[in-house]
């Protein structure tokens, strides 16, 4: 979900219990980018849900961050996607409730009109909110069955709270009163509040602070809540819990912090109604965070609808137009039907539709991803090369007893297929000695089998690592191939080790292009210089020095072309014994070459002198012969002169 670095930053942020909530939230927004908010929120959800954090201040900070991540602004609430007409329009019948209140302060009555949309599975109850005071005491109620309420100082909206003695609960149908209703992390608030309601006081999971604060997140936070530190909120909650003597809603004011926290007591039945309220409105709202990652909200929660009627109930003090459920006419139906909701429906995955997937097949479904068979057209002769060689050997010894194999025998043995299958195994792992000998024998009989083996430059490094001898035998057969340059280039660019040097040393025994071996030596020197680990560097330098000495000793390379580069390499690693030996070897080789050059020059000069002397002697002899011949035959001299 998040890496260890972000997790450490998040845990340090949860420990800042001495800072106000809004400061912590600002630090959170500056630390994590907007694209990571949902991911970090999921991490907070997980550590709270699984109980990885138990300190009350840390849990409060986590709840506040989850609450503030998707707190809607006024501009968002006024947009078309979040308008009250599109969000607050269920499929059930809607009614309007009009209530007249008596003001106890000035003994005058002022009408208060509240238009709300009511879900079909709830009934309205008479409320008596006050429009002047910020905190309502229990004595301000005008009816014994009415629900006490408090005024939210943030939005100046009167929010009812549930009482244990009430039979029904009222839910205000206004998006401004439920900013968390569109928060994808709402299930954690409901689940943790359910734990507190179900847990006893002696239970280790019981936390009176969360039991008091979580209902505020589900409705509306007080005005100065974000300006207080988690420690101050915990102290206020503890004092509020100690001073509460009744089950009705009370307001606690401390002299040091000047903040009011309404003590809301939510029963389990009212929490289920809140769940239904949330689930009814879930399909009508698009969460941008989930839509951006490709999750569409296709799950619609259908609840059975009921019909409602409107009756007028006059009283002595107030005149109220109350909606009464038709179930009240029948005593057997005078109960609210609680629809059981699974915990999975409130989890993250409730936003994503579940598809029924077919059962996996019995065979391994991933075999086709990396096929081990190199498919290709393999044409075999009526008689394979091995069978033909066997017949030829038999014919020399006993020609009258030749048994020609049957067609089934000749077609069942395909040397191309055998070499290709063994090469595929050799690339993936080590072969047995018998399999290595089988590949060598097949390619010795028919060298063209190396072209059908399926070896590519991409697979060559794996073959060198797993089966060095097979790589040597195959490359020796491919040395005249036009693709050999690609193979050797791959061999040069792969990681320098003993196996690759062994392959190059074996290839150096045949006629290679003159630039291949110097190119590989240059690559080895560069690799040694780039190694950071000292021990690994010394080991590689020793290996390279021994390799170059073996090439010089076998007269495979001419050190003149690499004299400066190798000499610099030896001087750089002069503390290594093998480097000193290589330095002496290249100097001795250079001196020997110079001596041989001088000797050859002197020998050539001596040879030229001897040739000149011989020519002079020959000329003298010819002249003497002519004189002798002239004395005997004077006419020949005259003819020769003419």
Curated annotation (Swiss-Prot):
Localization of this protein: Cytoplasm; Nucleus
Function: Component of the CCR4-NOT complex which is one of the major cellular mRNA deadenylases and is linked to various cellular processes including bulk mRNA degradation, miRNA-mediated repression, translational repression during translational initiation and general transcription regulation. Additional complex functions may be a consequence of its influence on mRNA expression.
Compositional bias ranges of the Low complexity kind: 589-625
InterPro entries: CNOT11
Similarity section: Belongs to the CNOT11 family.
Record protein name field: CCR4-NOT transcription complex subunit 11
Knockout-associated phenotype: No obvious phenotypic change is observed.
Swiss-Prot/TrEMBL keywords: Cytoplasm, Nucleus, RNA-mediated gene silencing, Transcription, Transcription regulation
This protein's record includes keyword Glycosyltransferase: no
Any Gene Ontology CC annotation: nucleus
Keyword presence, Transcription: yes
Sequence segments annotated as region (Disordered): 78-167, 589-627
Source species, domain of life: Eukaryota
Disulfide bonds: none
Secretion signal, residue range per the UniProt entry: none
Subunit description: Component of the CCR4-NOT complex.
